[in-house]
Amino acid sequence: VDFASESXNKRENQQIVDKHNAL
């Protein structure tokens, strides 16, 4: 498992969730 890409994916997913919550 590449922890660097894992954390990047988590950050991207969190940004997506934040966008949906902002709507």
Swiss-Prot record:
One of its GO terms (biological process) is defense response. Residues 1-23 are annotated as: Disordered. One of its GO terms (molecular function) is toxin activity. The keyword DNA-binding does not apply. Its main location: secreted. Residues 8-23 have a biased composition (Basic and acidic residues). Keywords: Disulfide bond, Secreted, Toxin. Transmembrane segments: none annotated. Expressed by the venom gland. It is found in: Secreted. Contains 8 disulfide bonds. GO terms for cellular component: extracellular region. Belongs to the CRISP family. Not toxic when administered to cockroaches at doses up to 5 nmol/g. This is Cysteine-rich venom protein 24. It comes from Naja kaouthia (Monocled cobra).
